[in-house]
From Swiss-Prot:
Family of this protein: Belongs to the universal ribosomal protein uS14 family.
Name this protein carries in UniProt: Small ribosomal subunit protein uS14
Gene Ontology terms, MF aspect: rRNA binding; structural constituent of ribosome
Gene: rpsN
HAMAP family linked to this entry: Ribosomal_uS14_1
Origin species: Bordetella petrii (strain ATCC BAA-461 / DSM 12804 / CCUG 43448)
Source organism phylogeny: Bacteria, Pseudomonadati, Pseudomonadota, Betaproteobacteria, Burkholderiales
């Protein structure tokens, strides 16, 4: 089990990213728009830099929903390889069977 402080930090980052997603998208659209003046684009870049660092979605870490482990997480299931295998062997994940050929 990962430390609760690290799990809570990632949850906090996810909430912050959701809160500022529209504002970030708006500013990035202005920055990428070639029809805007250089001054407008520069001001948009400064405003983007003023947003909280943790509002950037790339600072989030995929974690296992059961254990909070940050490595070896399968996106489709949200589980680490350990818990995925364990739950698949118990039959707790529908549609997953052990391979045999």
């Amino acid at each position: 089990m990962a430390k609760l402080s690290l799990i809570n930090r990632d949850i906090k980052r996810a909430k912050l990213a959701d809160k500022y997603a529209a504002k970030r998208a708006e500013l990035k659209a202005i920055i990428d728009d070639q029809s805007k003046t250089d001054e407008e684009r520069y001001q948009a870049r400064l405003k983007l830099q003023q947003l909280p660092r943790n509002a950037n979605p790339t600072r989030q870490r995929n974690r296992c929903v059961v254990t909070g482990r940050p490595r070896g997480v399968f996106r489709k299931f949200g589980l680490t390889r350990h818990k995925l295998r364990e739950m698949a062997m118990k039959g707790e994940i529908p549609g997953i069977t052990k391979a045999s050929w």
